[in-house]
Structure formats: structure tokens, C-alpha cells
Amino acid sequence: QLERMERLEAPKNESGVAHISFEAAEESGKEVLQVHDVKLGYDLTHLLAEHVSFDVTKQHIVALVGQNGIGKSTLIKTILGRLPLLGGEIKLGANVSVGYYDQEQATLDPKKTVLNSVWDDHPIMPEKDIRSILGSFLFTGEAVEKNVSALSGGEKARLLLTKLSLEKDNFLILDEPTNHLDIDSREVLETALNEYNGTVFFVSHDRYFINAVATEVLELSPEGTTFYDGDYDYYLEKTRAEQEDYRAKASFETKTVEK
């Protein structure tokens, strides 16, 4: 690891808006993620969902939606191997490298400074380059010397995105990436994901964000998953139509029984 003797000034970002970009260093295979008949939960006595099956294809952006507490974050942690697989199969495709954004921000070390949080991951990168990248994410001047424990939720979110952008993975798994971000940063993140040459699987409650970036929507329920080939508006339109069909069928069956 290089000696860090000289303290350099981080270049100022005059615009006041973070510059976020992602680029995959290597291409993955066409099939990025395959999930087949997975049981979802913390243990077999407390299952959240069963028969979870879906595929994620290269360069698609898939939004995972569902009711609160249904297990969206649990599914992500199971895919990442942070929770045990209770049943079924999860398979990453050829040459897939995963970058993870944790909504709980637990992947950050609270004892490290902003600068060291990034530099420790890339020790051979010159300090001026690290500071320049941090500056583009609005960490300028003395802000890079702050401890992670002293950062706001928004600052931690930007630090996580800084680290993610430097990894150059080809499959980003993002758990509520817009939480804590201001409107300008959200819009920049939308652009960055739309220009990204890799694949994205993300959870969000922000329908505007989903509409701006998702190519497909995956709905998680206790009975499994349903894939919708479109944005959030398309998903709402299709689910509304399905509910109307269900109500019409139920009404018809009730009337038939009454006769």
C-alpha cells in the first residue's frame, strides 16, 4: 500500500450536483441471473414466499416490486449469499461480477474516513485521482477527512455510489438506491443507469424512478413472482386489468351459483 504522506486538496465541483457514472469493465454472458423455485425467508418455519422463479438477461434493468414485508430485501440477500437458500436454485451466469448497494448502508465502516473508505479498496490508485472522483460525488475539501460515522444518510448514499462506480462490475444489485438522495442526485442516478453497459436488478418504492429506468418489472408475492415486460405504468395497467378480470369472473360465478 502506498504511503499517504501528502494531503492534497480535492477539486471543487462547481455545479453542486453529483456526477455519477457506471461502466462494466467486462461483458457478462447473456443469462445473468437464473432463479428457479426458490423458497424465501429466514428459515423454513417462517417462509415469506415460495415458487420464486425468474431470469435476468444481459443489459436489462429489472425493478423488483411488492408489498412491504413481502421479502424483497430478503430475496436480494439470498441472491448475494448473505442469507441461506432454503430451497430451489440460484445461478449467476458466465463472467458475472456483482456490485451491491445496501440500503442499510451497513457495508460502510463507520471508523474510516471518506477518503480511506475508497482508497483502501483501490490502494494503488493515486490520491489525487481518488480525491477527484470523490469531488465529482460532492466530497470536496475537508469533507473527505470526515469519519463515515459523522456523515448524513445522503452523504453515505453518495459514498456507496462512489465505491460502486469504481468497481466496474457488470451486474448491479441495488436495494432502495434513491433513499436519502436529493432530487438532483436521483436524476443523475437515473441517467447513469440508463447509460450503463451492464445489467441492473433493483428494489425501489419510487414509481417515478422505476418508470425512468426499468425495462421490466418483477412482482414478488407469497405465491411467487410475475414478470411484466415494461415500466411501472405498464405494470399498474396490467395488474389493474387483471384485478378487473378477476372481479368480473368472481361476480359471474356468484350469479351462476345463485341461479
Predicted feature descriptions by range:
Residues G16-A18:
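A generic structural signal for short beta-strands and their flanking turns/coil linkers
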